[in-house]
Amino acid sequence: MAPKGEKKPAEKKPAEEKKSTVAEKAPAEKKPKAGKKLPKEGGSAAGEKKKKRSKKSVETYKIYIFKVLKQVHPDIGISSKAMGIMNSFINDIFEKLTQESSRLARYNKKPTITSREIQTAVRLVLPGELAKHDVSEGTKAVTKFTSS
């Protein structure tokens, strides 16, 4: 008599095999979701070292907004939500100015965007008094930069 752990499966008859192939479908395999990655089999080898991913540096104007706020109103703070809105506002204005200045450079068939194109873009993008103040502040900044 064979030990209990070693039972041999009974042989199937050829007639039963034909019925099972026609009647049964192979179970559908589940595909892993696109967002999740399966871990690699075998783990990490002894010779392999994992490379650390460096974080992408996201440039914001938050520190500069805060510095200007403290110059203008030293006693007033700003919430993180308001800071995010101000950062988005500055990014939007800079985007508009760069688009306009590049368009001006293309119209004049110039390969370089100079302070003149930026100044004209400021006059076109920003309204009235704001444009005048920005042009004067920009001119002051450029003269300070060139003199130093």
From Swiss-Prot:
Cross-link Glycyl lysine isopeptide (Lys-Gly) (interchain with G-Cter in ubiquitin): which residues? Answer: K144
Q: Which family does it belong to?
A: Belongs to the histone H2B family.
Q: Give the main location.
A: nucleus
Its recorded name reads Probable histone H2B.2
Ranges for the region named Disordered are 1-57
Q: How is it modified after translation?
A: Can be acetylated to form H2BK6ac, H2BK33ac and H2BK34ac. Monoubiquitinated to form H2BK143ub1; may give a specific tag for epigenetic transcriptional activation.
The record's annotation in InterPro entries points to:
Histone-fold, Histone_H2A/H2B/H3, Histone_H2B
Question: How does the record describe its quaternary structure?
Answer: The nucleosome is a histone octamer containing two molecules each of H2A, H2B, H3 and H4 assembled in one H3-H4 heterotetramer and two H2A-H2B heterodimers. The octamer wraps approximately 147 bp of DNA.
Taxonomy, top ranks, is: Eukaryota, Viridiplantae, Streptophyta, Embryophyta, Tracheophyta
Chain ranges passing through the membrane: none
Q: What function does this protein fulfil?
A: Core component of nucleosome. Nucleosomes wrap and compact DNA into chromatin, limiting DNA accessibility to the cellular machineries which require DNA as a template. Histones thereby play a central role in transcription regulation, DNA repair, DNA replication and chromosomal stability. DNA accessibility is regulated via a complex set of post-translational modifications of histones, also called histone code, and nucleosome remodeling.
Instruction: Quote the subcellular location field of this record.
Output: Nucleus; Chromosome
Q: Which SMART domains match?
A: H2B
- Alphabetic keyword roster: Acetylation, Chromosome, DNA-binding, Isopeptide bond, Nucleosome core, Nucleus, Ubl conjugation
Q: Source species, please?
A: Medicago truncatula
Check the record and name the SUPFAM superfamilies matching this protein: Histone-fold
Extract one GO molecular function annotation from the record: structural constituent of chromatin
Residues recorded with modification N6-acetyllysine:
K7, K36, K37
Under the cellular component aspect of Gene Ontology, which terms does the record hold?
Answer: nucleosome; nucleus
Q: What are the boundaries of the signal sequence? A: none
Bias regions of kind Basic and acidic residues — which residues?
1-32
